[in-house]
UniProtKB/Swiss-Prot annotation:
Stretches that traverse the bilayer: 7-26
GO biological process: photosynthesis
InterPro entries in alphabetical order: PSI_PsaM, PSI_PsaM_sf
Cellular component GO terms, alphabetical: chloroplast thylakoid membrane; photosystem I
Keyword terms of this UniProt record: Chloroplast, Membrane, Photosynthesis, Photosystem I, Plastid, Thylakoid, Transmembrane, Transmembrane helix
Cellular localisation: Plastid, Chloroplast thylakoid membrane
Pfam families, per the entry: PsaM (PF07465)
Family to which the UniProt record says this protein belongs: Belongs to the PsaM family.
Source organism per UniProt: Euglena mutabilis
Topology versus the membrane: Single-pass membrane protein
KW Transmembrane (keyword) present: yes
HAMAP family, per database record: PSI_PsaM (MF_00828)
Keyword Transmembrane: yes
Protein's name in the database: Photosystem I reaction center subunit XII
Phylogenetic placement of the source organism: Eukaryota, Discoba, Euglenozoa, Euglenida, Spirocuta
Length: 31
């Protein structure tokens, strides 16, 4: 079963969104 570009895009979003929020939260806490 091949991996489509859509699946890659969804996987990237799934990985990046929590990381983005963690980074944003970390910056808020470091103030």
């Amino acid at each position: 079963m091949g991996i489509t570009s859509t699946q890659i895009y969804i996987a990237l979003l799934t990985a990046l969104i929590p990381a983005f929020f963690a980074l944003k939260l970390g910056r808020e806490l470091n103030k």
